[in-house]
């Protein structure tokens, strides 16, 4: 169970980082 929760947290974290970087890239383009 804890492993599953950690996996979910890691996935959410990675997706958040990707969104952050994409937003920064978008703002730099404009």
From Swiss-Prot:
Annotated coiled-coil segments of the chain: none
Membrane disposition: Multi-pass membrane protein
EC annotation from Swiss-Prot or TrEMBL: 7.1.1.2
Bilayer-spanning residue ranges: 7-27
Transport as UniProt keyword: yes
Record's catalysed reaction(s): a ubiquinone + NADH + 5 H(+)(in) = a ubiquinol + NAD(+) + 4 H(+)(out)
Localisation: Mitochondrion inner membrane
Domain of life, source organism: Eukaryota
GO MF annotations, alphabetized: NADH dehydrogenase (ubiquinone) activity
GO CC terms, sorted: mitochondrial inner membrane
Alphabetically ordered keywords of this record: Electron transport, Membrane, Mitochondrion, Mitochondrion inner membrane, NAD, Respiratory chain, Translocase, Transmembrane, Transmembrane helix, Transport, Ubiquinone
Main EC class the enzyme belongs to: translocase
The family this protein is said to belong to: Belongs to the complex I subunit 5 family.
Function of the molecule: Core subunit of the mitochondrial membrane respiratory chain NADH dehydrogenase (Complex I) that is believed to belong to the minimal assembly required for catalysis. Complex I functions in the transfer of electrons from NADH to the respiratory chain. The immediate electron acceptor for the enzyme is believed to be ubiquinone.
Protein name (database record): NADH-ubiquinone oxidoreductase chain 5
Organism: Pisaster ochraceus (Ochre sea star)
């Amino acid at each position: 169970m804890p492993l599953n929760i950690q996996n979910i947290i890691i996935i959410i974290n990675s997706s958040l980082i990707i969104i952050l970087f994409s937003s920064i890239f978008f703002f730099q383009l404009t």
